[in-house]
Amino acid sequence: MVLIAFGSIGDSFSVGSLKAYVAEFIATLLFVFAGVGSAIAYNKLTADAALDPAGLVAVAVAHAFALFVGVSIAANISGGHLNPAVTLGLAVGGNITILTGFFYWIAQLLGSTVACLLLKYVTNGLAVPTHGVAAGLNGFQGVVMEIIITFALVYTVYATAADPKKGSLGTIAPIAIGFIVGANILAAGPFSGGSMNPARSFGPAVVAGDFSQNWIYWAGPLIGGGLAGFIYGDVFIGCHTPLPTSEDYA
């Protein structure tokens, strides 16, 4: 049975942990800047027209590439989470303590918010698009969609990055993670927006001042990420081991 470790103040404020928080902040900022920036660019080029298939592909590819790079640049320092749902999933599997994970969340949310503030400034005040479910769908349907696609993301993180038996598969973890996010945006984008990431949705909501549907992008991803962490960590990895360093799961 996997054990969840709460952690200690000393560990969470060690030099290594502080460096990890900075790495999460920077990597999340760069990911969200590119991801949300691609959506803003689409709206500008199309005069805020409805998202068409070409635009969906462009936004999905931008997120996939940006996440691939973001995970890669943070992997050796923080593990390259960039996502509270990933952090929760890894905490459920015993790969990071709850306390340290909480500070990861803060760094990720701050990174996303700063990215969106920068986008608002450099685009001369263009609207920062927020996530929301499509017309005709309800919040529960959006939550279920986000549970499924976030489960797929965190399951991929476990299989390619966190599993002790991953071997050489770990070298493709960042690109596999980017691929699953891009694919999920193609599948879910027209319905729930395809967030999979509370931080990705939080920053735009803060800058736009619109939290009307933001709960969907906390509930769905956290449930999906937690389930993936429990199933892969408990069923497939199967036993608790001492908390690894970031290099062991990134």
Curated annotation (Swiss-Prot):
Cellular component per GO, a single term: plant-type vacuole membrane
Protein location: Vacuole membrane
Membrane topology reported for the UniProt record: Multi-pass membrane protein
Transmembrane segments: 20-42, 55-77, 97-119, 140-162, 172-194, 215-237
Keyword Nucleotide-binding in annotation: no
SUPFAM superfamilies: Aquaporin-like (SSF81338)
Positions of short motif NPA 2: 197-199
Keywords attached to this entry: Membrane, Repeat, Transmembrane, Transmembrane helix, Transport, Vacuole
Biological process terms in GO annotation: water transport
Tissue expression as described in the entry: Roots.
Motif annotated as NPA 1, chain positions: 83-85
Hydrolase is among the record's keywords: no
Gene Ontology MF terms: water channel activity
Matching NCBIfam families: MIP
PANTHER family in alphabetical order: AQUAPORIN TIP2-3-RELATED, AQUAPORIN-8
Domain remarks: Aquaporins contain two tandem repeats each containing three membrane-spanning domains and a pore-forming loop with the signature motif Asn-Pro-Ala (NPA).
Family listed: Belongs to the MIP/aquaporin (TC 1.A.8) family. TIP (TC 1.A.8.10) subfamily.
Primary role: Channel protein in tonoplast. These proteins may allow the diffusion of amino acids and/or peptides from the vacuolar compartment to the cytoplasm.
Name the UniProt record assigns to this protein: Probable aquaporin TIP-type RB7-18C
Organism from which the protein derives: Nicotiana tabacum (Common tobacco)
